[in-house]
Amino acid sequence: MGTVVLKLTKEKQETVISDFTRHQVSPPPYARFAARTAGCIVTVYNSGKVMFQGQEAETVAVRYGSPIAKKTVSPASGSLPEGFANWSVVGSDEVGKGDFFGPLVVVAAYVDKTKIELVRELGVRDSKNVSDPEIRTIARDLHAVIPYEYRILHNPDYNRMQRTMTQGKMTALLHNSALNGLLTRLDEPPQAILIDQFAEKAVYYKHLSGETNQVKDNVYFSTKAEGIHVAVAAASILARAIFLKEMDQLSRQTGTEIPKGAGAKVDQVAASLLLRYGPERLQEWTKYHFANTKKAEALAKKRNRP
């Protein structure tokens, strides 16, 4: 099925709407009009973009303007096929690896090529450029329009596993599990899977050496993958939203606003919790092998001095 996207003036948008009014159907989120004919689906988004999909998409779209140039971003290594940004892709990303408090979260999300424009309309982009309130809003919208699978490794399990394996291996196991879960739910396999690279490909699969069901078909790895395909950006936003929800719950449990990251503010809060609840409870809420533990212990000792 062909897809053409035009950026049209308000006047041209109204022309499209007028031409397709008798074929009108209920529009998707962030769209003000949609129509379906035998050969083409037309969607007019609030942003002014108009998407034509179907066998007659190009023939119909050319009546109204020239298509927006499609993004074909690839890493410098050239390891991804041409036009990859417009494929139907499962993206996978993780959140929480560098945070002392809170779990490790991995999300695998599928964006069909027919939904790429819709996902962009929802505001999906590199999550580092999105505020926490917006993350929550976009994640709610994504929940309604794309399939995804998530895995949460809570701190008690994280600390237990960390005694015998690296964080990298834990992360790889979570990615593989989320990918397996999502793939079993899809009606047809994606054109590709893109993992935001946290380890070299050989190292990633070495981490999975003991796993029976290793996802290997059409799997690509790239750093800064959020900027390469919107599926990874969507996965990252969903993972962050889940992580934020977990942190909210942790704040309620402790009666303290729990900060993200692993900086000096984290040390101060950890020291306070250590004094109030003791080391066993602190271990339930943190990645205990981080250097923050020793720093919090030192701060707690200073505060306890007469």
From Swiss-Prot:
InterPro entries: RNase_HII/HIII, RNase_HII/HIII_dom, RNase_HIII, RNase_HIII_N, RNaseH-like_sf, RNaseH_sf, TBP_dom_sf. Keywords: Cytoplasm, Endonuclease, Hydrolase, Magnesium, Metal-binding, Nuclease. It catalyses: Endonucleolytic cleavage to 5'-phosphomonoester. GO terms for molecular function: magnesium ion binding; RNA binding; RNA-DNA hybrid ribonuclease activity. It is found in: Cytoplasm. Endonuclease that specifically degrades the RNA of RNA-DNA hybrids. This is Ribonuclease HIII.
